[in-house]
């Protein structure tokens, strides 16, 4: 039995030049995940943490009370260890520069969706936390700048998510494969339960909000029809599974094989998901697990961000399914 802490130390030992900063950040995330897990598990017992907070994020979306709690928990956990120089969140209008001396001398910045799928909390559906870590590009010792956050996804040094479901799992990559750790609340420890995770090349699930079908581009409509058609050679029809929480849908497809799609639409002409907080970290995980992630045409990780809360269409999952979806998108764009 190997704990997350032991695993982090073991991996750090493989890099003699490593000074432990990244390990410290992962430990901060581990602590934040435990605290968020505790609050989610008692959400049905306390009206103080259920429902709408009465505020909106920069995208104009109503913030749930647990959104605000998770955001502040992540921020405080990172600030306590002083291993990141700055922090950006889907819930904040702008990035936060940590101003104390040790934090300003840190090499890394972190971006997060602190509680993905939070609108599901009130009905006891799985939610998650997503995180993404980069090396800063601004001079060490100075406050972080916007350029530190507007980096292509290929420059990530680590990304991952925590899924709060029937069990709580932390899944992450540092660019050398994907590993999953299940939380044992009796011990207070994350235990390595899913080493070297690989997404099946061929999938059998497609995850998309079909209630928005009439608003989708023709390429997506054709792919949905393709998924629903019978064909023994490709084991179709595929099964439709859509939870409405990116982390939960991605996690199922990572284990079982499938594709998750949130495309452009007449309602969201640029897509709905955020490139920096959702697209890049999940795309990094997908590629490290042997899958693919695109915007329907090009790899997500190659997109150069132009703004902090940039939206992107998102196709992620088993390689064969993403390639097929992209093929329909490209044919309909010609």
UniProtKB/Swiss-Prot annotation:
Q: Which reaction does it catalyse?
A: beta-D-fructose 1,6-bisphosphate + H2O = beta-D-fructose 6-phosphate + phosphate
Give the location in the cell.
Answer: Cytoplasm
| Statement: the UniProt record of this protein carries the keyword Cytoplasm | yes
Q: Which Pfam families match?
A: FBPase, FBPase_C
Keyword annotations: Carbohydrate metabolism, Cytoplasm, Hydrolase, Magnesium, Metal-binding
Q: Which pathway does it operate in?
A: Carbohydrate biosynthesis; gluconeogenesis
Q: Which residues bind substrate?
A: 116-119, 209, 242, 272
Which domain of life does this protein belong to? Bacteria
Q: Tell me how the cofactor is bound.
A: Binds 2 magnesium ions per subunit.
The answer to whether the entry has keyword Magnesium is: yes
Q: Which InterPro entries is this protein grouped with?
A: FBPase_C_dom (IPR044015), FBPase_class-1 (IPR000146), FBPase_N (IPR033391), FBPtase (IPR028343), Fructose_bisphosphatase_AS (IPR020548)
* Cofactor(s) it depends on: Mg(2+)
Residues bound to Mg(2+) 2 are: 113, 116, 278
Annotated Gene Ontology cellular components are:
cytosol
GO biological process annotations for this chain's record? Answer: fructose 1,6-bisphosphate metabolic process; fructose 6-phosphate metabolic process; fructose metabolic process; gluconeogenesis; sucrose biosynthetic process
Q: What is its EC number?
A: 3.1.3.11
Q: Where does Mg(2+) 1 bind?
A: 90, 113, 115
Q: How does it assemble?
A: Homotetramer.
Please name the NCBIfam families in this protein's record: PRK09293.1-1
Q: Which HAMAP family has this protein been placed in? A: FBPase_class1
User: Would you tell me the protein name for this molecule?
Assistant: Fructose-1,6-bisphosphatase class 1
């Amino acid at each position: 039995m190997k704990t997350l802490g032991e695993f982090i130390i073991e991996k750090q030992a493989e890099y003699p030049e490593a000074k432990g900063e990244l390990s410290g950040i992962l430990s901060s995330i581990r602590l934040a995940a435990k605290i968020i897990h505790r609050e989610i598990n008692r959400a049905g017992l306390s009206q103080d943490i259920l429902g709408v907070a009465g505020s909106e994020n920069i995208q104009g979306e109503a913030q749930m009370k647990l959104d605000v709690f998770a955001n502040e928990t992540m921020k405080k956990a990172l600030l306590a260890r002083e291993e990141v120089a700055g922090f950006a969140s889907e819930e904040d209008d702008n990035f936060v520069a940590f101003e104390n001396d040790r934090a300003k001398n840190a090499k890394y910045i972190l971006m997060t969706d602190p509680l993905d799928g939070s609108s599901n909390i009130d009905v006891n559906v799985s939610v998650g936390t997503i995180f993404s870590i980069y090396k800063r590009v601004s001079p060490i010792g100075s406050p972080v700048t916007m350029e530190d956050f507007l980096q292509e996804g290929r420059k990530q040094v680590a990304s991952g998510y925590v899924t709060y479901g029937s069990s709580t799992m932390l899944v992450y990559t540092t660019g050398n494969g994907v590993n999953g750790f299940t939380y044992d609340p009796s011990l207070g420890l994350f235990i390595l339960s899913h080493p070297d995770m690989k997404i099946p090349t061929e999938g059998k699930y497609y995850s998309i909000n079909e209630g928005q079908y009439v608003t989708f581009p023709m390429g997506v409509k054709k792919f949905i029809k393709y998924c629903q058609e019978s064909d023994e050679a490709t084991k179709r029809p595929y099964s439709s599974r859509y939870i409405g929480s990116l982390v939960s849908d991605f996690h199922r497809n990572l284990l079982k094989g499938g594709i998750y799609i949130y495309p452009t639409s007449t309602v969201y002409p640029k897509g709905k998901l955020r490139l920096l907080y959702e697209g890049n970290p999940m795309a990094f995980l997908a590629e490290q697990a042997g899958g693919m992630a695109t915007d329907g045409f090009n790899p997500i990780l190659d997109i150069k961000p132009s703004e902090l809360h940039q939206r992107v269409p998102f196709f992620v999952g088993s390689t064969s399914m993403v390639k097929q979806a992209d093929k329909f998108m490209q044919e309909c764009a010609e």
